[in-house]
């Protein structure tokens, strides 16, 4: 998202969007349609069908083949520079982060210590993409949770390509500011000094003392009112190195949507995680109407949960607040990276459950299915549920299933590992060499069926994207849906990918006539 407008006014910023394309669009993945048959004339079809094809190929060789077929995988390997926003507690770091990324993601409250983790967000300024890293308030004389926060800030300082050191114009220099400035002066990383809360030109006189920190000219900024940040971003881009120091940053916190039909226990689960009554909970279906974002620290990570109202009726037949709650549930799924689908295990699986599941898979989101109210199960119901799973959830065998009780806390500790595994696979990429080794073996075991009197050849495979994983097969003819399902099954047998949909897309390479024209 381009954030240049973030410093122009106080309008509502756009929320985080989600990828929900169900159809394969070559333009989305860097393919170029051309009249030269993908510029792949150097490759003979018989070469691709050779069982030994590609065995001794290097990564560079596979990249040449991908390029010949019109595919540029560089967007999957994009390495971005990082700017870390550091400073003592309550100087306005998270507000500045929100300005830098052009949307309200970082948590902003008017008391110290709100940001407890080192969290990264993607920003786009002047056509350049980079990471903006929000940190907790740094203080050298703290213990407990605040010591952990300070440690996260130090890690950010050690891995960032540029550091923005934020001080408070209204408060002036504190002892913590001086200690931190001395630490930054010893660092080899470029530092930009930002004097935040510069809300009036009458404060120019207050800027003078910040020169004593030894970090150069302070940039007067009002993050709250969107003033001065553009100059800081221009300077950040100027100071970025050609290659980033760290290439292993993941945007976070990861976004989770709790979804399911009304009264299935979404709010109860959220409250159990949060340890507080975050949402109004009642046995009346549809108690929670609006999604409520909650940042919650579980055992391993900080997560952003969205608690939704649930779908009582189909959107077309719902009325009033139910209609808008349904629309918001769609929005929550689109905005999430991972969906936890809650199903009431004590009742038969319903059409509503199936409908919400279809929304998730159509949107291409990572998925964990939580069978709630397990404390109400008896032996007869368990037998019935096993039968329902075989009939109604057979199309998502890849989804992790956890039996829980949000009321008693049963097995809730198993949810986070399942969520992490699903997201790891949602983000995962298989090398082109591994893909084509698997493809040769799968085709040798079961060749594609004849179509129109001709046997289609599968020439080559590459992974076009992640989130969700999309595998593109270049072929000489169309592949039947049943054969694509076979390939997906063999793909999962080899590589796993539990917890995420995997899309198998086919791109037919049309044959040329002897004169070089397509037939």
Curated annotation (Swiss-Prot):
InterPro entries, alphabetized: G_ENGA (IPR031166), GTP-bd (IPR006073), GTPase_Der (IPR016484), KH_dom-like (IPR032859), KH_dom-like_a/b (IPR015946), P-loop_NTPase (IPR027417), Small_GTP-bd (IPR005225)
Annotated residues for binding of GTP 1: 87-94, 134-138, 196-199
Keyword terms, alphabetized: GTP-binding, Nucleotide-binding, Repeat, Ribosome biogenesis
Annotated positions binding GTP 2: 260-267, 307-311, 372-375
Domain called EngA-type G: residue spans: 81-244, 254-427
UniProt keyword Ribosomal protein, yes or no: no
CDD domains the record matches: EngA1, EngA2
Region (Disordered): 1-54
Family statement: Belongs to the TRAFAC class TrmE-Era-EngA-EngB-Septin-like GTPase superfamily. EngA (Der) GTPase family.
Assembly information from the UniProt record: Associates with the 50S ribosomal subunit.
Record-given protein name: GTPase Der
């Amino acid at each position: 998202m381009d954030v240049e407008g973030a410093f122009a006014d106080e309008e509502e910023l756009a929320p985080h969007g989600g990828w929900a394309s169900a159809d394969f669009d070559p333009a989305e993945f860097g393919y170029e349609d051309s009249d030269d048959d993908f510029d792949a004339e150097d490759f003979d079809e018989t070469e691709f069908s050779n069982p030994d094809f590609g065995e001794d190929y290097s990564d560079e060789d596979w990249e040449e083949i991908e390029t010949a077929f019109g595919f540029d995988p560089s967007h999957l390997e994009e390495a971005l520079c990082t700017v870390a926003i550091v400073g003592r507690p309550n100087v306005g770091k998270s507000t500045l982060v929100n300005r830098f990324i052009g949307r309200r993601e970082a948590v902003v409250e008017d008391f110290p210590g709100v940001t407890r983790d080192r969290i990264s967000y993607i920003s786009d300024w002047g056509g350049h993409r980079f990471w903006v890293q929000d940190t907790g308030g740094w203080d050298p004389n703290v213990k407990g949770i605040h010591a952990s926060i300070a440690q996260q800030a130090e890690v950010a300082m050690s891995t960032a390509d540029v550091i923005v050191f934020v001080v408070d114009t209204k408060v002036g220099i504190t002892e913590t500011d001086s200690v931190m400035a001395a630490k930054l002066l010893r660092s080899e990383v470029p530092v930009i000094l930002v004097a935040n809360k510069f809300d009036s030109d009458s404060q120019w006189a207050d800027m003078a003392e910040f020169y004593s920190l030894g970090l150069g000219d302070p940039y007067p900024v009002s993050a709250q009112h969107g003033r001065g940040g553009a100059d800081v971003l221009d300077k950040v881009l100027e100071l970025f190195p050609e290659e980033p120091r760290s290439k292993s940053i993941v945007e976070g916190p990861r976004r989770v949507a709790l979804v399911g039909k009304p009264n299935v226990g979404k709010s109860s689960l959220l409250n159990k995680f949060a340890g507080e009554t975050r949402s109004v909970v009642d046995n009346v279906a549809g108690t929670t109407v609006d999604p409520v974002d909650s940042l919650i620290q579980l055992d391993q990570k900080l997560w952003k949960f969205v608690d939704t109202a649930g779908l009582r009726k189909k959107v077309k037949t719902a009325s009033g607040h139910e209609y808008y709650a349904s629309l918001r549930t769609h929005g929550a799924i689109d905005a999430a990276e991972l969906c936890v689908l809650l199903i009431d295990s004590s009742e038969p699986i319903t059409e509503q459950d199936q409908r919400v599941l279809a929304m998730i898979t159509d949107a291409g989101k990572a998925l964990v299915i939580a069978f709630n109210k397990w404390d109400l199960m008896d032996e007869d119901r368990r037998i019935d549920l096993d039968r329902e799973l075989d009939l109604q959830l057979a199309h998502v065998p890849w989804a992790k299933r956890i039996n829980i009780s949000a009321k008693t806390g049963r097995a809730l500790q198993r949810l986070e590992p399942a969520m992490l595994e699903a997201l790891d696979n949602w983000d995962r990429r298989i090398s082109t060499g591994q893909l084509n080794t698997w493809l040769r073996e799968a085709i040798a075991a079961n060749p594609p069926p004849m179509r129109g009197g001709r046997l289609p050849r599968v020439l080559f495979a590459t992974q076009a994207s992640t989130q969700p994983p999309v595998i593109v097969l270049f072929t000489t003819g169309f592949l039947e849906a049943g054969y694509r399902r076979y390939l997906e099954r063999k793909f999962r047998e080899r590589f796993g990918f539990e917890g995420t949909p995997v899309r198998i897309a086919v791109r037919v390479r049309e044959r040329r006539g002897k004169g070089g024209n397509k037939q």
